[in-house]
């Protein structure tokens, strides 16, 4: 019996995992870039608990383990979401078995849960709310599984809620349901156990925070961004989540939950009416204990999520921006409840004679309907990913000297997808550039400086969800056509989900002047400073412009210092080079920092110069050379702790882009094994 249950659980997991891989959408959420950067920081430099995202360790701990074991890749980034969302089917199966359903019925119920549109959607995206949903699901399982062992139940539930709390503070929204469970059923030992365990666990964690950041409650001081909702918009805000559940995406008009909420409410209404009409207690139409438990759980969570203010100020009603992924934690209990109600239909007297056939007849079409609606729910992400991966493939094949694309797309290409071992493309990431007119202005201003063969990606807008549809190189929003020097390489599928549909396109720059890499470098015109001979004033005014990001203006002052005060020009040489680095002019920055390292071998700036040179090499696609420079810096400049620690962190990142711990262990084992076999 145990073997059959394990095999059933394995089949559920594999089915769910395969469905999530099939409908995989990629990095299409607006905060994916921020969270990926967070994970890289934690992996290379450790967490900074003064930041609210770092503080919420439940958001990144699974990805940290995945990167540590498998190395940094899209696959290892998404593995926790694919795997943990697939586990929810096993949790559903285990709960249904505890509530008295047969193995086949529980298996079909688990299939219904893992195939539900929103469950699949959350599993195909980098949705951190999924981890709170998992904590709630495991807490519910522990509550049911250990009812006869209240001490163990209390400890398990407390641990689940503690972990969920450090994904999102919204974990406290389950406390009313938990209180109803313990008080209504007079489970005083369990209530005492979960209370004491929670106090001990949270108390120890708060003591840890105080030791680390000097505050017992940093999650109150650093919390998510919220906004004061005007009174005339309260109804609109309160209707946001219900509309997402019942109508779907307001951006694309696609479903999110499919038929699940309609099935849930329709069957629940039947049960409520049947219970009110006092049908026999043995009737499957009567509300049972599991119905009440699930209803109180998802119902109270929804009410608090929708109406309770977000924040710790009460001078107005504060809310976070209401986006679809925030509903994720309540999706599992809702979907499980719908599955249970469908299974209860198969227990009606007319169907009870053949329960297996009834369950198959009812649940298999429901699962197929789920999959059909899942395709609709994930369609925008699928369309985007198809174009994204096709563009990536062509860029990898072409290996252009430079690549120009929307900032987020470019950063993913450079930092996640392009092979650091073979890529030699300088991917231009235009930070702080958002709307199409900004990108168009940048392109027209810099086109003359781009080398022959530079590639440009257009039509591939920024992230899919949260409305960044007018960001990036969107030709439909350009004020004029591209320069005729841009030659079309390929047109990809049309991004039909956009308000103004546009195909992704890849372009190559032709007829650009070829500039010798070792040619003479332009010098700044310092004639405007001919009468200024005060070293202190030149330094002050140059740094003032540097701090205001007027790098071209700052370089005039630094050049004047370098020419007129060569014996005191050390700082000016460094910031002169750094100004090019700040502008992402990697070739020029590398050249200037090399000059500094050669001329000022014993300068306090030399270690920092080596770090900047290595970073330029990496951004120009030469990871091998970057690694050599970083290793040199660590070996020869340990006396500069800041530069050495930066170099160590960057070395770690470069190595983890190639492989993780398991890869290194495999090489260590397989190498001697191959030599022995030979």
Summary of predicted features, one role per range:
Residues 19, 191-271, 301-305:
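Membrane-lumen/periplasm interface segments of specific transmembrane helices
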Residues 10-11, 159, 196-199, 341-373:
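Signature aromatic-anchored transmembrane alpha helix within multi-pass, membrane-resident enzymes
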Residues 43, 47, 98-100, 137-154, ...:
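Membrane-interface transmembrane helices that cradle and orient dolichyl/undecaprenyl
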Residues 31, 55, 121-131:
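Short acidic/glycine- and proline-prone juxtamembrane loop motifs at membrane-interface regions
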Residues 23-38, 50-65, 72-75, 170, ...:
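Extracytoplasmic catalytic/substrate-binding loops of multi-pass membrane glycan-assembly enzymes
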Residues 361-417, 425, 431-432, 517-528:
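Membrane-embedded, lumen/periplasm-facing catalytic core of multi-pass transferases
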Residues 142-145, 150, 173-203, 272-279, ...:
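Perimembrane helix-loop-helix junctions
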Residues 122, 129, 173, 315-346:
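Hydrophobic/aromatic-rich transmembrane helices and adjacent perimembrane loops
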């Amino acid at each position: 019996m145990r073997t059959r249950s394990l095999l059933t659980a394995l089949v559920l997991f594999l089915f769910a995992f395969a469905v999530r891989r099939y409908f995989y959408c990629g990095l299409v959420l607006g905060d994916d870039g921020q969270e990926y950067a967070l994970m890289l920081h934690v992996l290379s430099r450790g967490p900074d608990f003064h930041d609210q995202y770092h503080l919420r360790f439940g958001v990144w701990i699974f990805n940290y383990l995945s990167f540590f074991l498998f190395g940094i890749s899209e696959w290892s980034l998404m593995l926790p979401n694919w795997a943990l969302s697939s586990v929810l089917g096993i949790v559903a199966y285990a709960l249904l078995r505890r509530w008295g359903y047969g193995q086949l019925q529980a298996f079909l119920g688990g299939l219904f849960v893992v195939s539900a549109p929103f469950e699949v959607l959350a599993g195909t995206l980098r949705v951190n709310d999924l981890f709170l949903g998992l904590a709630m699901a495991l807490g519910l399982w522990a509550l049911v599984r250990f009812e006869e062992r209240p001490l163990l139940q209390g400890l398990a539930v407390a641990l689940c809620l503690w972990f969920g709390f450090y994904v999102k503070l919204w974990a406290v929204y389950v406390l009313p349901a938990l209180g109803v469970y313990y008080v209504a059923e007079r489970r005083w030992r369990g209530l005492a156990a979960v209370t004491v365990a929670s106090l001990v666990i949270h108390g120890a964690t708060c003591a840890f925070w105080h030791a680390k950041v000097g505050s017992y409650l940093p999650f109150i001081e650093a919390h998510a961004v919220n906004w004061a909702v005007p009174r005339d918009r309260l109804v609109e805000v309160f209707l946001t989540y219900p509309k997402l559940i019942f109508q779907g995406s307001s951006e694309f008009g696609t479903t999110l939950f499919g038929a699940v909420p309609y099935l849930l409410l329709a069957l629940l209404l039947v049960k409520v009416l049947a219970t009110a009409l006092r049908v026999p207690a043995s009737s499957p139409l009567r509300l049972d204990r599991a119905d009440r438990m699930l209803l109180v759980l998802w119902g109270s969570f929804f009410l608090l999520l929708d109406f309770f203010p977000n924040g710790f100020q009460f001078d107005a009603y504060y809310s976070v921006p209401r986006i679809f992924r925030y509903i994720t934690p309540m999706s599992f209990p809702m979907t499980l409840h719908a599955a249970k109600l469908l299974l209860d239909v198969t227990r009606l007297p007319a169907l009870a004679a053949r329960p297996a056939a009834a369950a198959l007849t009812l649940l298999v079409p429901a699962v197929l309907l789920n999959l059909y609606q899942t395709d609709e729910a994930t369609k925008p992400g699928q369309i985007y990913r198809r174009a994204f991966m096709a563009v990536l493939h062509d860029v990898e094949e072409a290996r252009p000297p430079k690549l120009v694309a929307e900032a987020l797309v470019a950063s993913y290409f450079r930092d996640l997808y392009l092979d650091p071992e073979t890529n030699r493309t300088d991917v231009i990431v235009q930070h702080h550039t958002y709307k199409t007119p900004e990108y168009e202005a940048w392109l027209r201003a810099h086109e003359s400086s781009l080398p022959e063969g530079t590639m440009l990606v257009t039509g591939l807008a920024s992230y899919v969800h949260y409305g960044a549809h007018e960001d990036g190189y969107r030709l439909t929003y350009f004020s004029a056509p591209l320069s005729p020097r841009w030659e079309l390489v390929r047109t990809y599928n049309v991004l039909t989900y956009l308000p103004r549909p546009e195909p992704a396109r890849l372009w190559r720059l032709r007829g650009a002047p070829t500039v010798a890499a070792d040619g003479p470098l332009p010098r700044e015109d310092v004639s405007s400073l001919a009468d200024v001979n005060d070293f202190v004033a030149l330094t002050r005014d140059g740094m003032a412009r540097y701090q205001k990001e007027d790098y071209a203006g700052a370089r005039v002052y630094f050049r004047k210092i370098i020419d007129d005060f060569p014996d005191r020009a050390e700082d000016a040489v460094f910031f002169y080079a750094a100004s090019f680095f700040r502008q992402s002019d990697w070739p020029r920055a590398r050249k200037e920092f090399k000059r500094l390292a050669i001329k000022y071998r014993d300068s306090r700036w030399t270690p920092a110069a080596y770090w900047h040179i290595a970073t330029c090499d990496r951004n120009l696609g030469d990871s091998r050379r970057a690694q050599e420079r970083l290793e040199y810096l660590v070996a020869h400049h340990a006396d500069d702790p800041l530069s050495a620690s930066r170099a160590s962190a960057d070395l770690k990142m470069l190595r983890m882009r190639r492989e993780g711990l398991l890869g290194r262990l495999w090489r260590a084992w397989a190498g001697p094994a191959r030599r022995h076999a030979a």
